[in-house]
Amino acid sequence: MERDYWYSVARRAGQLDDLEFIGTQAAQRTLRRLDARHLQTRRLPVIFQAEVARGLLGHLVRAISGGALYRNASFLLDRLGQPIFPDWVRIDERPHLKQALGSAPFDSEGVATCAHDVVNAGVLQSYILDSYAARRLGQQTTGNAGGVHNLFINSGDKD
């Protein structure tokens, strides 16, 4: 038996997808799972669905978060300023977008949030630090107590 799901989130109830659309999406996703087959191991270009990309991005965020860094529990420790992706990848944080779910003028410590690059041209530009982690690492807070705010991945002309 195959199964899948779909959902909608928004700041305002009127912006939510209607129930018929949600049901149709869930049904279509479930049907696409039928007759799946295994492929032999090979190197191929991959396109991730948005839901999968969010999960992968979550792993990156955890690896560059202050807690993992000051505990020496990150594979990206001491990688600031170094390439971690191909040069066409940019990941930036935009905390002040109107109506966006992650928008916030301040982090959970009251520090002002600001737009900035996390990765630019494949190079790690910024860690994700609250005040405590920043002090432990001898750096400045990035206004990310409580997490990140509206991360965007841009791969230039590869989009």
Task: Show the residue positions of the predicted features.
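Generic signal for short, ordered secondary-structure residues
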Residues: 5, 9, 70, 88, ...
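Internal alpha/beta scaffold segment
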Residues: 1-64, 68
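Dual-mode signal for accessory low-complexity, basic/Gly-rich regions
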Residues: 63, 77-159
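Surface-exposed beta-loop-beta
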Residues: 67-78
